[in-house]
């Protein structure tokens, strides 16, 4: 084999091997940051406690506003919409008019007819932020003539 032929095989493999093309190693700085975060979270519950408290607060605010919050024992706050087009519309309005990003959850992730929005408040979210989200959702629900919780 000549040098060109010997060189062609690794190039071919690199060009067509999805395991190589779609794999990127993490930088040492990023790995160090992740390790520091894991060590911190193992030693501290401040962030977990804050996230749980904020999830409970947001659930209470949304329920108080009459919005259809689904039962959840986790930090995820699911809000039932029940229609994929309306879920997307709500997400689009939240982003365009309020600067709030949420991903609508549609089929096949959830069964048809059970489309929803899932909010995940973090420990750094404040009560005014969550109040603003609640007010935005209340306004959007009225604008789109969506049913409130029973």
Model-predicted regions and their roles:
Residues 17, 45, 55-56, 137:
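Short amphipathic alpha-helical/adjacent loop interface patches that line ligand
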């Amino acid at each position: 084999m000549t040098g060109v032929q010997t060189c062609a095989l690794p190039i071919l493999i690199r060009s067509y091997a999805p395991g190589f093309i779609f794999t990127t190693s993490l930088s040492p700085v990023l790995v160090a940051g992740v390790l520091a975060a894991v060590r911190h979270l193992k030693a501290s519950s401040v962030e977990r406690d804050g996230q749980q408290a904020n999830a409970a607060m947001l659930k209470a605010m949304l329920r108080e506003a009459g919005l259809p919050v689904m039962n959840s024992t986790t930090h995820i706050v699911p809000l039932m919409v029940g229609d994929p087009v309306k879920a997307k519309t709500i997400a689009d309005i939240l982003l365009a008019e309020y600067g709030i990003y949420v991903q609508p959850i549609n089929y096949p992730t959830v069964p048809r007819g059970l489309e929803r929005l899932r909010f995940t408040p973090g420990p750094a979210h404040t009560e005014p932020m969550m109040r603003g989200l609640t007010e935005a959702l209340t306004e959007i629900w009225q604008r789109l003539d969506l049913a409130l919780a029973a």
